[in-house]
Amino acid sequence: KNCIINNKSLIEHDAVIGNHCHIATGAIINGEVSVGNETFIGSGAITKQCISIGNNCIVGAGVILKSDVRPNQVIKN
């Protein structure tokens, strides 16, 4: 609900995107990933399959996520 999903981003099978999220251009959300509410995924960021990203997180541009992210975290290169 009320999400922004930019061009050339990819959201794969069984991924769940929370409310009020922003998925930037070129981000790749792999299968079975859960993205919490009010989370920002930066341009070119990539998630490994089957991880969880908490509420109110910021994942910076180009970050490769390989494990779960707790709520209210900022992940950058």
Sequence positions of predicted segments:
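Glycine-rich hexapeptide-repeat left-handed beta-helix
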Residues: N7, V16-H20, A24-N77
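Hydrophobic, well-structured mid-protein blocks that either form specific transmembrane helices
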Residues: K1-I11
